[in-house]
Amino acid sequence: MSTSPHPHPNLGTITAKAWSPTPGAAVRQAATVVVLRRAATGMQVLLMRRAPREGDIHSGASVFPGGLLDAADAQGSALCSGLDDAQASAKLSLPHGGLAYWFAAMRECFEEAGLLYAAAQDRSHLDAAQLAQIAAQRTALNRRELTMGEICTRFGIHLAADRIAYLDHWLTPPGVPKRYDTRFFVAEAPQLQVATQDDHETDAQQWLSPAEGLERRKELKLAPPTYKILELLQRLGDVDAVLAHARAQANVPCTMPRLATGSKGLRPVMPDEPCYAEIGHVDPEGHGHASYDLAPAQALRLSPRLIRITANNGSMMTGPGTNCYLIGGGDRNEWAALDPGPSDDAHVQAIVDAAPGPIRWIFVTHTHKDHSPAAQALQRRTGAQLLGMAALHAEWQDTDFVPDVPLAGGERFDLPGDSTLHVIHTPGHAGNHLCYRLEQERMLFTGDHVMQGSTVVINPPDGDMGAYLKSLRALMALDLDWLAPGHGFLMPQPRRAMQQIIDHRLKREAKVLQAFGGGGPYSMDQLLAAVYDDVPPKLHAMARRSLLAHLLKLRDDGVLAETPAGLWGKAGARVPGATAI
């Protein structure tokens, strides 16, 4: 029996009184069973409540039955039937020893919940009398007066490994005092048996639908793996679908939350959160100093040569706010500011305060009013040189930005702190848009060319959809590890991120072409309703600008044509007047 039977990462927000991050904690192996049953109202799942223990932050948490692997589990795996070690190890992506996890999961389920997944030597099911005799040994097993292997031998049974299926894999984040590498299995509740708590490790149990468990998440003190698995069960819907899903999985990825701090204190961050990859980059050992918030005016050190400050201009269009990056350092302790942001005295002060040394250069990606207007104020405060490209169109631009050093793309700057900045002209979002590659970190500062969590607005005449896609494809040829966007956290897998943007734009383009199935001509209003029927009306003003960008690209490609009356039809077709879509 495990001394810590419920290996889940920390619960919700963690208070400093509970514990502090502990980098370097050893990782222990564990196994858990998600037990399901069929009820009149649908699928239900078994949750056990952890008994209270002094100093245990998991006391009272509702969990699936499970616990640590014991040394005897490796030997006990010889008493499993329906699966051999080679098959089990392959499912877990282990070289060997995989069947011990199956044995441990079934042992723990019997110890804690009184549910036994076992079969007679001839693989037949056990009858009620046999099950009652074995159940009587549960107390001795929990007292360690007997082992599971001894029970199997005494009663001539095998643990039925083929009756549970591998479902999920979770690893406690670095920094948590007790770390667990936990394999989650799933099974239907065995026949002729009733789940009961052991009144030692667990003091209560209940059957709930996944929806009920999720609704009561806080009350039940569900740990991240528990509620994430409940979400999966809810999506799949019924017992058969869950078991089929588990058995069909070829590779089960390992999910590891990461610790970070922010407005809600120290908490685990899930891999699907935008900040996850950055947290791993900034704080791989789990000291807890990385942030899951982009808080205005707070400087965050992303590397020895890189600091980020976010402006207090968050909105639907700017996301959490515009990022300003400080690049440099080294022996000279001199810095460059990239994208100083909107005209905001408090933000300019925050940039000055964040710089460990004098700011000598101010680089700008483009002259939209959330990126460059602070350049003049920051220059007045620091005497720094302005570098970038002046606005090519007056509309929606910061026309006051006049660079001391005009850039066209292709330039390289050797900055302090062994920091080499390569300038790349990337028209599309704006005609004067520049991206900057920090060569030593294989990082691209994308401005608005790539944003986290949304697609950028392509707004003609300065915005050009054809140029945008061409620029993206050119960037995909670069050797990059990270994107540093003008809005959002650091982004991993740059090629994948850019390909997703291209795919999204081309999917929308295909929808534009589909709207011309009847030939046309069509008005902008007709096309907007057909092409952006998946976009809320409140966003249709911006969608209209993107639609125009698509139409202009297709016109330049020779696919569509615009009439003098402002209608759109297929190139070469006669277009006397607007028709209905």
Located regions from the model:
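N-terminal leader/linker segments that precede catalytic domains of diphosphate-processing enzymes
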Residues: M1-P296, R301
